[in-house]
Amino acid sequence: MITKLIKNNDLLFEELYVAGPHVFICKKHPLASKDLITAEDLQPYPYLVYEQGNNNSFYFSEEFMSMLDFPKNIQVRDRATLFNLVIGLNGFTVSSGVIDSKLNGSNIIAKPLDINKTMRIGVVKKKNTVFSRYACFYMDALKKYLSIV
């Protein structure tokens, strides 16, 4: 769906990073000592996802696992609430594994998820658009942070 929208709207996707999916959990979570977490391991715990709004942007969800059915789901609107519930409820979310302890603190950790999928992280922009000097600076910093320069 997203590929079709990119093509039909004269957009370009620039891939920055390919990530294996990771589970974000509290460092005191019962699964925190595992090197690799399975979907089955996660069944007893609440799955925290971002609310996608009224226009149903399900297909743009950063949580590609939103297509899977977990028995306990909680929708949140912001990162702070999500991380508070990850800690307070032994919940989890799934993302790229890129996490910054300076921004998020040291209580949240990322563990690889045992699933044969990848996540393509990138930037969508209008074709023939030239980034401003500040946008170029930001992109360079982002690529450096992702260690792909």
Regions found by a protein language model. Name each.
Residues 40, 120, 124-149:
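Extended ligand-binding regions for polar small-molecule ligands
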Residues 64-74, 107-108:
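A local structural motif
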Residues 9-10, 36, 76-79:
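Structural motif corresponding to alpha-helix initiation and N-cap regions
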Residues 3-4, 49, 69-78:
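Short beta-strand-to-loop elements that line the ligand-binding cleft
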Residues 11-21, 25-47, 51:
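Flexible hinge/capping segments at coil-to-helix
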Residues 45-68, 131-136:
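Secondary-structure junction motif
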Residues 8-15, 19-20, 81-129:
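Beta-alpha-beta core module
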Residues 28-38, 115-117, 128-134:
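Short helix-loop capping/hinge motifs at secondary-structure junctions, enriched
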